[in-house]
């Protein structure tokens, strides 16, 4: 039997998703909890491996098991062995044709950026921060150069294991709400550090360091050295993974973040 799980986690508490020998990753803790509940080792396959500090609101995994359990018991039972920084949100039996990674046709990330002269300790690990004003319109104009199917090598980390740098970026939204600017990135898939590298460039344009069309030159150059430094991970959230309707994957629950009303207006599942 194949079971899919919806996972939420506070990325600030972990060294990324992927299992490591030190055991301080989300995958390590999740698989430990599953093994405690099931009394047998279970290996999970994830929709997208997030980096250290990146949060998960709509992460999806699957695993295979011969065990017979009431479906919701996978939620309740696994959560009993998880720390407060990770939670299984739902469980659903799936056909063998479902694959958490390869069945997904799109991913949506949000970035919450606090724009204020003084940093807030209450937002540590939850939102990015910049102390200088930003030009929203300039960032929107810059983002427009990135929409479409392109070679995103300029925004790819040296550790990226993707077979191709060509991705289709469907949407970048920039929305201001008080002292926050919220960014939404939707694509068929993302390269390692791609969203954080895009953020670094958009913020550089917003600060007036470069004109909006600079980003078109960076994209065309296909050279990571042309782009701005990688932006901080603190405000980055994997919000949604899109699957074909036949799998009826439950929607991500965004209400667990304080700016969920702003994100709801942007609607990550359209």
Swiss-Prot record:
Q: Which organism is it from?
A: Burkholderia cenocepacia (strain HI2424)
Q: InterPro entries in the record, alphabetically?
A: PsdUridine_synth_cat_dom_sf, PsdUridine_synth_TruA, PsdUridine_synth_TruA_a/b_dom, PsdUridine_synth_TruA_C, TruA/RsuA/RluB/E/F_N
Q: Name one GO biological process term.
A: tRNA pseudouridine synthesis
Q: Where is the active site?
A: 51
Subunit annotation: Homodimer.
Q: What does this protein do?
A: Formation of pseudouridine at positions 38, 39 and 40 in the anticodon stem and loop of transfer RNAs.
* Sites where the protein binds substrate: 109
Q: This protein's superkingdom?
A: Bacteria
The EC class name is isomerase
The UniProt catalytic activity note for this protein reads: uridine(38/39/40) in tRNA = pseudouridine(38/39/40) in tRNA
Keyword set, alphabetical order: Isomerase, tRNA processing
Name of the molecule in the record: tRNA pseudouridine synthase A
EC number in record = 5.4.99.12
Q: Which family does it belong to?
A: Belongs to the tRNA pseudouridine synthase TruA family.
Pfam families per UniProt: PseudoU_synth_1 (PF01416)
Keyword Phosphoprotein (UniProt): no
Q: Keyword Phosphoprotein on this protein?
A: no
Q: Which GO terms describe its molecular function?
A: RNA binding; tRNA pseudouridine(38-40) synthase activity
């Amino acid at each position: 039997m194949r079971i899919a799980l919806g996972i939420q986690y506070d990325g600030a508490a972990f060294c990324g998703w992927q299992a490591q020998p030190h055991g301080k990753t989300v995958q390590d803790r999740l698989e430990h909890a599953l093994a405690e509940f099931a009394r047998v080792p279970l290996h999970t396959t994830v929709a997208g491996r997030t980096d250290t500090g990146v949060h998960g609101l709509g992460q999806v995994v699957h695993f295979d098991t011969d065990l017979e359990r009431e479906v919701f018991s996978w939620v309740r039972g696994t959560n009993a062995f998880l720390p407060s920084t990770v939670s299984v949100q739902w469980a659903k039996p799936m056909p063998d044709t479902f694959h958490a990674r390869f069945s997904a046709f799109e991913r949506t990330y949000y970035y919450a950026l606090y724009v204020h002269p003084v940093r807030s300790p209450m937002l540590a690990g939850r939102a990015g921060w910049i102390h200088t004003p930003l030009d929203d319109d300039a960032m929107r104009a810059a983002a427009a150069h990135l929409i479409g199917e392109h070679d995103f090598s300029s925004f790819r980390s040296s550790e990226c294991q993707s077979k191709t740098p060509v991705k289709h970026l469907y949407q970048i939204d920039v929305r201001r709400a008080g002292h926050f600017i919220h960014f939404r990135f939707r694509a068929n898939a993302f390269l390692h550090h791609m969203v954080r590298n895009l953020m670094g460039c958009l913020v550089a344009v917003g600060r007036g360091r470069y004109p909006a069309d600079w980003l078109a030159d960076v994209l065309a150059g296909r050279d990571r050295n042309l782009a701005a430094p990688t932006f901080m991970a603190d405000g980055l959230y994997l919000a949604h993974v899109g699957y074909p309707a036949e799998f009826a994957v439950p929607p991500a629950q965004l209400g667990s973040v304080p700016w969920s009303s702003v994100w709801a207006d942007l609607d990550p599942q359209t």
